[in-house]
């Protein structure tokens, strides 16, 4: 890795540690009777210049979020009923930016998941926190209180000029603080 990718010893050690952790998690998956659940939240603080995902700026769609969650809850009930006999291995709430939801909405969604599915075989429950400008202490507390095992923060870049150009309304410092 050092020669091919010009990676530092520190980054090489980090990559190896992550690979070992992931290998341990993957070895626990039940590939025959298990499944993973992806839940999409299509709202973001703003639309990034490069983004190809289906997402909507929250400012324009805020009054539709609860209706979206109502529909999502019905879909979760359907999926849970269809898969009751299978082992739920992992859950990923992605987007968009799920942490654009208000704390009570995020809590509502996670509680619905916890009530609808058997999580006894779930080895990882991830919420994409995507953008540091959407993370608050209250939202982090909701995630902790609901047993979320992993969050994903994706700044896209650590160069402020690039963040500004691509439409990310957060700073490099906010990413570090997150």
Residue map of PLM features:
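Structural motif
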Residues: 34-36, 48, 124
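Hydrophobic secondary-structure block in the mid-to-C-terminal portion of proteins
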Residues: 34-38, 43, 60
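N-terminal [4Fe-4S]-dependent radical SAM core
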Residues: 1-37
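Membrane-targeting and insertion segments and their boundary/processing signals
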Residues: 22, 42-46, 149
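Local cysteine-cluster metal-coordination motifs and their immediate loop/turn environment
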Residues: 40-55
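Conserved non-cysteine loop/helix-boundary elements of the Radical SAM core domain that shape
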Residues: 55-178
């Amino acid at each position: 890795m050092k020669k091919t990718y010009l990676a530092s010893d520190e980054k090489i050690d980090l990559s190896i540690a992550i690979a070992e952790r992931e290998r341990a998690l993957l070895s626990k998956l039940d590939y025959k009777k298990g499944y993973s659940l992806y839940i999409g939240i299509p709202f973001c603080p703003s639309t990034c210049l490069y983004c190809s995902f289906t997402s909507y700026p929250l400012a324009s769609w805020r009054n539709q979020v609860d209706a979206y969650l109502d529909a999502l809850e019905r879909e979760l009930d359907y999926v849970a009923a269809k898969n009751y006999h299978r082992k739920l291995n992992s859950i990923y709430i992605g987007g968009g930016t799920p942490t654009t939801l208000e704390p009570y909405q995020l809590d509502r969604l996670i509680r619905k998941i916890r009530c609808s599915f058997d999580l006894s075989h779930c080895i990882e429950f991830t919420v994409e926190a995507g953008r540091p400008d959407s993370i608050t202490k209250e939202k982090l507390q909701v995630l902790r209180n609901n047993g979320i095992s992993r969050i994903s923060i994706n700044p896209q870049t650590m160069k402020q000029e690039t963040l500004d150009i691509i439409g990310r309304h957060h700073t490099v410092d906010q990413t570090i603080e997150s």
